[in-house]
């Protein structure tokens, strides 16, 4: 299982050093929570900060950008150019999801779809052959420190079944990532459900 620390847990005044220490410890998949103050109430960082972080850390770390922004189809290229390897967009915030994830992959990044707790899994299933990752939010996005929502189990299991069938039919494998309330006491449970990537610290 991939453990992806959320960079928002770091002191943003010392972000480069904090991320460097994470990478040195073997945690080279870094989760970047990008918030625009519109899709979610909070505001974090954008492409200029990410580009500086990439320059400081080099090419080794995987930058996994979770775009909590409106109209991500109009801005994702900036994050690819800044050095992000993975770009995940919210199904609720993109007008043409299939077109958006296809454009992300055409730009050279892996594409992901994010599902809020209240968003049905079918939103991701519609584009499953075109994506590399589904990020299931197990808290409501935009704020840290929330408790894990356990009823995401049904969504995860349904998604895992669809991915397994897609692979059996010769299609692409798709990672299941979970973000929100992931702790030592529930990470084994998530793995048993079929999760392959956990964001921690959010």
Where are these regions (language model features)?
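Conserved N-terminal beta1-alpha1 strand-loop-helix module at the mouth
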Residues: 1-88, 92-96, 103-111, 124-131, ...
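Short secondary-structure boundary segments
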Residues: 34, 91, 115-117, 138-139, ...
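Predominantly soluble domains enriched in secretory-pathway, periplasmic, or organellar proteins
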Residues: 101-103, 119
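C-terminal alpha-helical cap/extension of soluble enzyme domains
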Residues: 165-168, 173-202
């Amino acid at each position: 299982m991939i453990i992806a620390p959320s960079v928002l847990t770091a002191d943003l005044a010392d972000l480069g050093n904090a991320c460097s220490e994470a990478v040195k410890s073997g945690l080279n998949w870094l989760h970047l929570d990008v918030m625009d103050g519109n899709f979610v109430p909070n505001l974090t960082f954008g492409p200029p900060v990410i580009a500086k972080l990439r320059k400081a850390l080099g090419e080794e770390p995987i930058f996994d950008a979770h775009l909590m922004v409106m109209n991500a189809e109009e801005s994702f290229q900036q994050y690819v150019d800044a050095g992000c390897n993975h770009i995940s967009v919210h199904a609720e915030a993109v007008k043409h999801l299939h077109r958006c994830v296809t454009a992300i992959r055409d730009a050279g990044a892996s594409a992901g779809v994010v599902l809020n707790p209240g968003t049905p899994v079918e939103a991701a299933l519609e584009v499953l052959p075109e994506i590399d990752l589904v990020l299931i939010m197990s808290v409501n996005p935009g704020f840290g420190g929330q408790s894990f929502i356990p009823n995401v189990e049904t969504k995860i299991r349904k998604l895992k079944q669809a991915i397994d069938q897609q692979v059996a039919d010769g299609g692409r494998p798709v990672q299941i990532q979970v973000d929100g309330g992931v702790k030592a006491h529930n990470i084994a449970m998530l793995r048993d459900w079929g999760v392959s990537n956990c964001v921690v610290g959010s």
